[in-house]
Amino acid sequence: MSFRSRFIHLHVHSDYSLLDGAAKISDIISKAKKCNMSHIALTDHGNLFGAIKFYKEAKKAGIKPIIGIEAYMAKTSKFLKKQDDLGKMSYHLILLAKNELGYKNLLKLTSISYLEGFYYRPRIDKDDLEKYSEGLICTSACIGGLIPRLILANRFEDAKNEILWFKKVFGNDFYLELQRHGIKDQDIVNERLVKYSRELGVPLTAANDSHYVNREDATAQDIIVCIGTGAKKSDENRLKMETNEFYIKSQEEMCELFNDLPEALENTVRIAEKCDDFKITFPGPILPDYQIPVEFNTLGEYLEHLTLEGLKFRYKNLTSKIKDRAFYELSVIIGMGFEGYFLIVWDFIKFAHDNDIPVGAGRGSGAGSIVAYALRITDIDPLKYNLLFERFLNPERISMPDFDIDFCFEGRDEIIKYVTNKYGEDKVAQIITFGTLKPKAVVKDVARVLDIPFAESNELTKFIPDGPKVSLKEVLDDNSLKECFTSKPVYKELMNAALVLEGMNRHASTHAAGIVISKTPLTDYVPLYKDYKQGSVSTQYTMDLLEECGLVKMDFLGLKTLTLIKNAENLIRSVNPDFKIKNIPDNDVKTFNMLGEGRSASVFQFESEGMQQILKDAKPDSIEDLIALNALYRPGPMQFIPQFIAAKKGVKRIKYPHPDLKEVLRPTYGVIVYQEQVMEVAKIIGGFSLGKADILRRAMGKKKEDEMNEMKVDFLRGAIEKGYDKEIASEIFELLKPFSGYGFNKSHAAAYSLIAYQTAYLKANYPEYFMAANLTNEINNNDKLSYYIEESKAIGINVLKPDINRSFREFRVTDSGISYGLNGIKNLGGIVVDLIIDEREKNGKYSSFEDFIRRVDDKVINKKFLESAIKSGLFDSLDQNRKTLFENLDHLIEVVSEDKNNKKLGQNSLFGALESQDPIQQSFNYQTFKEYSYSELLGFEKELLGFYVSGHPLDPYKKAIDSFSSLNVLTDLAAKKDSIVQFSGILNSVKVIQTKRNNAKMAFGVIEDFKGAIDIVVFTESYERYRNFLLEGNVIGVVGRLTFNRDKFSIVVEKVVNIERLSEYKINNIHIKFLNNKLNDLQLLNSLKESISNFEDNSGFSNVYFYLRENGKDLKLKMNSILNFVPDEDKLDKLRKCVIVEDVWVD
């Protein structure tokens, strides 16, 4: 900018000052531009989370960015974890980067604060500042700074000494910061700072410590602090700003505020101009050095050697087709300079294979590379399944290759540890990610702060659609919804704050899969963050920024299915020592018969009820079919499933857009399913190279009209040159457009379908071992354990109760069924379980409960363990029932303990050596008790195992429950979100609360069926109607809307059905079409609604839908709640006679 500002903001917080700052970076930049500021700084609390985003957006807007932090500084050493002599643990300090060296020092300082100095806050100390002060400007910050704190404590000499220390370290780049927010303590501090400035020759600077953009955003900032601290706005003595002056003020406002200290204003501009040369260099990904054996001269030569050796391992006969494909890929990889990347990936994959850590068949487009297949990075043959290399690495579009690797869930950490050891702890880290305040979540968070009852906020969020692109502003654009959200003053306050806070960062966490590796220490490129709850170190920058900053990114994903397959393999080898999952046939009839019958529960990627039905209809008979169904079963392409099935069955003739496309489309029966097929069509018809075809696919997928139009010209030109009719070629091009958006990555579908086939093979051929492995895989997940036990029963496999003489750590297969894994019992720690099994294997089975007590170490096994073990049924196969063991436990422990002590005393006595080393022990005389009741025994199993094994309280009601329920809580939740569902089971818990707003009652509970449990919410109206049914232990059915809030699914209950009437109930759907010319008669419309409501007689459930036409659009509306009646002919006839009704029908 050509103008010179009169004031520059150098103390600015964004929402990356988590749950403290309430300003989005884009809004900060917009305000700076609006205020004609040439520069602006970003100084978030202790971090650089938003630095790169801020830098780029400011540059784009023509504003010079100043990168800084408001650091937390320990008064003495950052390693001291206690309060200092001022009663504080850290103090604020502003640090600004003058140049790239200053920026690099900020990277170091903020990293040190998290990795070394964290104590409630990420802290640095004076040693760090002395070491990394070059290139930095420092100001004394707010009244939370060290110098202001000393002034407020009347320690004036100490304050002066601190000023002199900072002046010595930073020289002319240290400034005393003045703030005027209308706070008394600031006035006290400012007076002293002005005095010291003149005494000590340290310049002043003015600041406004902005935490939000505009004055009117003060309430939103106050609320976000409440969200962070768990406070309510009405709470007294909570943390909050003292005034509403902490916003980005205009130059005019700041000049007026500091008109008595013009030098403080001028110095903000001088500081900004010191930063004019600041520039961040973005080097792009820099590969770490990979050491190759001395006999090879280059990385490319070594990669070629490994590839050829790998091809010999993969293929019996190396045909010219295989070698040509491999050498073509190698030429592209080496030509683009990515041979080092392939070697790095190969190296840690080799470590995994060498250490028996299962690796996935592939993930994403990487499975399209034959070099990756040869190196065992992937495990699916790209030639066999016609997978394209250019979908992964396109020579016509330079971008870093990106292998996403699935590892066995249990082995993933070993891989990360290996990579860290190989390249160095300072060169490997995980990646940060940020949770944001999404529309529904922000409404609920703000509602809590404003003390709006949960029931009310939940009702409000019902009007907010789900989806990544939904915004509150769009919701409020609907006038009817706007009226709802502003119907009360407190709702207006809620929405005003929510609109400001929506989309802001809420918390930092670690990316589930991302790993970065650098050539030199990471802090040469990025700042680091440590999550002290998890103990993981991650980058402060998000995944999308890391490669341009100089890092190489990998995705290491933990896939439980690989752990499952490994466990199943190990179990099967007890009966088939040579079994290997890699050697199973790919055309097993038993497997495809099972899938064709829809018996795919617990089969990877095919377990949902919807997919089970599709398998029944499609009758897949090859892995190619599974790949296609896997790709089609998702929103968008799902509409083509009937066409696919009809063509596969021969019901419908297969149509190809052109005979030349038959080979490409034959595996999918003429339906374009894959992105790779779009590329192949562009190659065959338009004469495109596969690289150019990939660019076309991307343009179509992202709906880039200009780019598509340009490429269509090339496509038609190429088609004509190849002899195709222009009109037909144009039709084919237009046909590709929707499919490129719907089309799925075949490489990914193929790799995952291979894993799916492997799990299906295991279930079909080794069901007991497969289910045992599933149970072990989910040993700490009660819901999943319950599901797999039910699935085991459904396929005729008995899951046995825990048995002290037959059970092992994990679930195992026995002649009688699957023995229960001891690690799945609550209060039985792994060490204790190991001790029990080791003793049993060393000295034989336990003959009685007393024998067990005498043989185990009483220092390891305590009373709580024994009580849990008894209740769980662990000793049922021995001599006494559970009640008898439980009631005699204290006495038995006492007797055995006394015997052990007597034995020790005897061995230490003068005559002990003459006594028998194994004295005869008296058998314990039990006082016998009648066994617990059946329901009590089941209750114990639920308590200790997390579910029921020997039976289920719902067994008598199974038929009624199965006929009533429409929801499988393990497989249907995502698919049925926001829809009306029916669910029945036992009420495990009920909590009734009284709302603060009107003292009405509502309830929360948990209801469980055979497959798992789900939360229920019962608002006041429904609670009052059904309160007599909502008792703990009752078996009931509920009807309501399935919702997802705070990362949790729940059913908002509208109706409750007594167990006796479950089988009688079903939901009827009544459809009413209006005569549009009569819709304006509100009296008639209201009369109709009243008539429908009067139909309620508790005879059943009905949804009522209205159909009308408004503004040229057909609309379908639903009455708010489910109504209690069955639509008999008499009621329907009354509806048809209404003068505004055109038609009525029921389904």
UniProtKB/Swiss-Prot annotation:
Gene3D superfamilies: 1.10.150.870, Bacterial DNA polymerase III alpha subunit, thumb domain (1.10.10.1600), Metal-dependent hydrolases (3.20.20.140). Coiled coil: none annotated. GO terms for biological process: DNA replication. It catalyses: DNA(n) + a 2'-deoxyribonucleoside 5'-triphosphate = DNA(n+1) + diphosphate. Its main location: cytoplasm. Its EC number is 2.7.7.7. It is an enzyme of class 2 (transferase). GO terms for molecular function: 3'-5' exonuclease activity; DNA-directed DNA polymerase activity; nucleic acid binding. It is found in: Cytoplasm. InterPro entries: DNA_pol3_alpha_NTPase_dom, DNA_pol3_alpha_thumb_dom, DNA_pol3_finger, DnaE2/DnaE/PolC, DNAPol_HHH, NA-bd_OB_tRNA, PHP_dom, Pol/His_phosphatase_N. DNA polymerase III is a complex, multichain enzyme responsible for most of the replicative synthesis in bacteria. This DNA polymerase also exhibits 3' to 5' exonuclease activity. The alpha chain is the DNA polymerase. This is DNA polymerase III subunit alpha. It comes from Borreliella burgdorferi (strain ATCC 35210 / DSM 4680 / CIP 102532 / B31). The lineage of its organism: Bacteria, Pseudomonadati, Spirochaetota, Spirochaetia, Spirochaetales.
